[in-house]
Amino acid sequence: MEGKKAVISVTDHGFLYGDAVYETMRTVDGKVWLFDEHIKRFESSAKVVGLKIPYKKIEIYDQIVSLIKKNRLTEARIRITLSRGSNELDFGPAKNPTFLIEAKKLTFPPKELYEKGISAVTFEIERPMAQIKTTSMLPSILAYQYATKKKAHEAFLVDHRGRITEGSMSNVFFVRRGKVITPKKYILEGTVRKLIIKQTRAKQTTVKYRDLPKMDEAFISSTTKGIMPVTRINGKKVGDGKVGPITKKLLSNL
């Protein structure tokens, strides 16, 4: 079904309250990349908010594959969403949850951004229940809009204690004296993030805003973008302002 023809109730809690969880995946050569890891996180998010997924894992996989084939997609961006459904104004348990699968062609940022790096800004805001992937995205939206206003590509969220947590749509990494580090707490643990931590033995730790000038390299990670170098933060160079050697190595390996 075409997206513009799909409808939901105006009383759906996902629409009214952002009372929903979701997961974004991608395909590589027609196969769903890191499917098990994504579904595990989807199940975890649903459990936290008290939602029961109406399909088994294999059924979801088959539905995704069928949708990809029907749309003749090889490189696709997939999103699955589960809301509490139409419960009128009652905040009680879900009676008729809404489950949705979307698939569309995956488009990557220009190659130049991977070669020269992107710019980021910092934005002081905190995302509640950061450990789950919920459709209540207002903090991330505000952060990204601020980045756009400043003509940057991404925003790094900073909490009230001056800690860098994550990007508006990504996880963040830094390199300091040859060691890869990444924020440990108050984040959504990305699937690509886990791969990077395993490959680089990255240290999960507290990263303070005041420590940004000390960083030699920076990059972000996400399912749809992969690894993307960050060469400027708040208008200032990261290291020498070029994509660093460790980031380059990761780009060639993932």
Identify what each model region corresponds to:
Residues 60-88:
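Short, acidic/charged, Gly/Pro-enriched secondary-structure junctions
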Residues 1-66, 90-254:
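Helix-start/capping segments and mature chain N-termini
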